[in-house]
């Protein structure tokens, strides 16, 4: 109506004209803000870097997410004509004509039903969820909370609105899936177990006695098991099922930092793993060389011990944890996580594929898978409550990672710990365990208990998508 009034009264408004303009709109709003990203007005720095011909008349450009990564594919190419004119500017003939090429159509792998289920399961807590298809690497869901409405950025956001987002202590603009760096805690114990088996340091039957702590030879310091009373004699099945720290302290020490680093790096930890995700962090997989270069200090045996339970210098993203777990599910076959399902009808190609994780004895994959199933389905499994009543087999691993250090001899006391200093809760899992079709990684900041808090989130998401993915009832 307002446009019509201006058009009718345009003779009274010299210098005013109505110009139609296409503007990007995100109908799902905050639901896909961290995966799709958003476009925004081209700033001065971007204007200098862009092709002035290709972007003539263009006012917006991809700023984050898929919008940023696939900017050139989505933008297309401008058309133009070269003409001959007379002195008055009248066109005499067309010398050359080039048709414009529209941007490519990109179909994403995200499942809106699964995305909604993941958001509902996570609730209002700060954290992230990422779900992958281990057979293809397709990202089925990506949630980072809190989120924001990307439509705010399309035509320009006010300073006040941007400051409210940027300065928020909850960091809604921060993509926790790709950029959040966290200690993985016990979620990496399956990968450490693979390292122990493949290197020959242990067998599935090797037993370690757990009195509730571990001590390095000739050292007094006690590295505590989460179960302070101890689990007694434990083999690999029991160690994974009970998330026994003492077993993995011992295993990490036997492996040594060099072998432990090299094996974990094969699973993508400490490096970028995605095919098409903007701003992904590499994380940190520490080594002796890294510490010498950055800290100018030698590597100490105790640092290897705590690395065996995902503590210390190590930092990973939730996406890396999902990918490492996908490799367990997929028996070492690498498929880089990606958001684009097709580009103009063609699936994206990984031009720099990662080498598969090849074990000396492929049966070791089944051994670790079995231990992860015990986590969920054995009466003593650490996350058995999360799998109660499930009509399919789940393989999972919980993780509870310290945010601040606790002194020797002290115990974690949530009532004396600031909310944002409380432990992070993590969980990774896949289902159905025998023929995995989905891998899920959940991280809840300051959630405290991986099995008790993050585990039910994974279960709720799996239940929501089970019928659609036709899982066998077991």
Where are these regions (language model features)?
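Beta-lactam-recognizing serine transpeptidase/beta-lactamase-like catalytic domain environment
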Residues: 85-97, 134-187, 191-442, 471
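Periplasmic/cell-envelope proteins involved in peptidoglycan metabolism and beta-lactam response
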Residues: 1-159, 181, 199-204, 209, ...
């Amino acid at each position: 109506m307002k446009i019509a009034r201006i058009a009718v009264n345009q003779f009274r408004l010299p210098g005013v004209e109505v110009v139609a303009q296409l503007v990007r709109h995100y109908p799902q709003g905050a639901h896909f803000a961290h995966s799709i990203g958003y476009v925004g007005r081209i700033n001065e720095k971007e204007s200098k870097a862009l092709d002035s011909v290709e972007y003539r008349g263009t006012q917006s450009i991809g700023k984050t997410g898929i919008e940023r990564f696939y900017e050139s594919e989505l933008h297309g190419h401008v058309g133009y004509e070269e003409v001959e004119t007379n002195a008055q500017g009248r066109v005499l003939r067309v010398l050359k004509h080039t048709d414009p090429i529209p941007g490519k159509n990109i179909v994403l792998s995200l499942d809106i039903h699964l995305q909604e289920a993941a958001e509902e399961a996570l609730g209002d807590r700060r954290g992230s969820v990422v779900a992958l298809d281990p057979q293809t690497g397709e990202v089925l869901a990506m949630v980072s909370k809190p989120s924001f409405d990307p439509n705010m950025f399309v035509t320009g956001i006010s300073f006040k609105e941007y400051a409210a987002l940027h300065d928020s202590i909850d960091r809604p603009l921060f993509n926790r899936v790709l950029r959040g760096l966290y200690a993985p805690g016990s979620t990496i114990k399956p990968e450490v177990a693979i390292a122990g088996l493949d290197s020959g340091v242990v067998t599935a039957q090797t037993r370690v006695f757990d009195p509730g702590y571990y001590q390095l030879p000739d050292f007094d310091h006690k590295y505590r098991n989460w179960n302070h009373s101890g689990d007694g004699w434990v083999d690999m099945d029991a160690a994974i099922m009970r998330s026994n720290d003492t077993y993995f302290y011992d295993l990490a020490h036997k492996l040594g930092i060099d072998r432990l680093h090299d094996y974990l790096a094969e699973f993508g930890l400490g490096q970028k793993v995605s095919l098409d995700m903007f701003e992904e962090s590499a994380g940190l997989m520490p080594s002796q060389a890294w510490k010498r270069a950055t800290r100018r200090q030698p590597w100490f045996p105790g640092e290897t011990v705590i690395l065996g339970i995902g503590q210390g210098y190590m930092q990973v993203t939730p996406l890396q944890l999902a990918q490492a777990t996908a490799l367990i599910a997929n028996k070492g076959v690498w498929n880089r996580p990606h958001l684009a399902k097709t580009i103009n009808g063609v699936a994206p190609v990984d031009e720099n594929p990662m080498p598969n994780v090849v074990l000396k004895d492929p049966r070791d994959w089944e051994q670790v898978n079995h231990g992860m199933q015990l986590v969920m389905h054995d009466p003593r499994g650490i996350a058995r409550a999360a799998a109660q009543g499930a009509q399919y087999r789940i393989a999972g691993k919980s993780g509870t990672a310290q945010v601040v250090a606790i002194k020797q001899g002290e115990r974690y006391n949530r009532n004396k710990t600031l909310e944002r200093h409380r432990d992070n809760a993590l969980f990774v899992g896949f289902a159905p365990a025998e023929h995995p079709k989905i891998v899920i990684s959940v991280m809840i900041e300051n959630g405290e208990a991986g099995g008790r808090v993050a585990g039910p989130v994974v279960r709720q998401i799996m239940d929501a998508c089970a019928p659609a993915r036709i899982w066998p009832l077991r």
